From Swiss-Prot:
HAMAP family in UniProt: UPF0301 (MF_00758)
Name under which the protein is recorded: UPF0301 protein Dalk_3037
Family: Belongs to the UPF0301 (AlgH) family.
One matching Pfam family: DUF179
Domain of life where this protein originates: Bacteria
InterPro entries: AlgH-like
GO cellular component, one term: cytosol
Organism the protein comes from: Desulfatibacillum aliphaticivorans
Signal peptide bounds: none
Family annotation (SUPFAM superfamilies): VC0467-like
Amino acid sequence: MTHIIQESLAGQFLIAMPALNDPNFALSVTYICVHNQDGAFGLVINQSFDSVTGKTLFDQMDMPAVKAAENQTVHIGGPVHQGYVFVLHGRPMEWKASLQISDTVAMSNSTDILQAIASGVGPDPCMIFLGCAGWAPGQLEAELAENSWLTCPGNDDLLFRTPLEERWEKAAQSIGVDLNLLSGVAGHA
């Protein structure tokens, strides 16, 4: 079955509606990296591990790391491929396995970017993730039609500089939505 994508959501945020009960996505903001006829791929940007830090990650990879890299937050990117490391970052964007998402944001998952981050010469800003979120063809469109998500344009301030605990509400506020006023029941006209 062919799924026609009206407009790619790459570079946009998905904001979980308050009624979304999936524990992986409740109160989440997900940055969409890829959205096409083959499905969608994104990274949850407002959840982090309590017990996994940059030090833990770089130690497991046998990479010596500077103090700033050891203190790097490791984010829970989603429930898929939880053993894989992904990096959302600004410039420079020319790493071995990079996908430029916007003029200012790329996603990479190669060893060279991780070595650069560990050495203190990686891209700034950057966020490290374990795991990702993925949708089969048509799945994200169905979830949007069910009102599981709001969408809003991506912006670097929310992505890289807003505290994690504020991202869900700030993303909604960026499109004029007060999440506290939304009903848990969806309707269609």
